[in-house]
Amino acid sequence: MWNCKDKRCVLLPEKMGHVRCARVADYAAALNRGNMYEVLDVNERNVKIRTEEGRVRWFPHTCFVPAGTPLWYLVDFRIGADVEAEPCVQTEVTVVLQQDESEPVHSETRWCYFVTPQYLRQRFEEQAASNEAILPVQLGLNGMVLPVLSHSSIAQALRYLEMQDQLYICTEPL
C-alpha cells in the first residue's frame, strides 16, 4: 500500500485501504488528527478521502501515515520560568509525550525552549558591544521563537506542533 524510500512515503494506487491522519496542516476544519480515513483514490501528491462531514476531498500525502502507525500526543508540560513575570524572554519547557496504539503504553519526557525576539535582540546587542565577531544564534530543532512568552502562548505553540505531528521532532529527550 505504501512505497517508502528516501524517508518519503507514497501511497500506491493499486492497494487502497485506510490511512491515518497524522498532520492536519491547513485542514484543521476538515481533518482530525489520529482518525482513520478510507482511501478513495490517489495520485502522485494527494489522497482522496471522505471527511467526517461526508465531503469527498483531496489532501496532500504528507497529512497521512499508514493505518496502525502510532502517533505522539502531549500529556503534560511544565514551564521552567515564571513566564507571567515581566519580562520573560526565554524559558525551557519539559513535555510529557505519550504514544497511542502501543502496548504497553509508551511515554517519554522531553524538553524544548522558547525565546522572544527581544531575547535575540539582546544577544546580538551584547555581541556588538563586546566587539567580538557577530555569530548566529542557532536554535536547533528544539528551540522556537514566540512573540511573547506566557502560559497560554506556550500551550498554543505546543498544541500547534502536536497537530502538525512535529512535537516529538521539535523536542529532545531528557
Regions inferred by a protein language model and the residue ranges of each:
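Small, basic N-terminal interaction modules of short regulatory proteins
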Residues: G17, R33-M36, G68-P70, A81
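Basic/aromatic-rich interaction segments and small domains that mediate binding to polyanionic partners
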Residues: H18-H61
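Short, compact, well-ordered microdomains
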Residues: T51-V56, H61, H151-L174
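Structured surface patches comprising rigid loops and adjacent beta-strands/short helices at the edges
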Residues: P60-T69
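Mixed-charge, Lys/Arg-rich low-complexity intrinsically disordered regions
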Residues: W2-G17
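Short linear motifs in intrinsically disordered
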Residues: R8-L11, N35-V42, G80-P87
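Short helix/strand-capping turn motifs
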Residues: G68-Q166
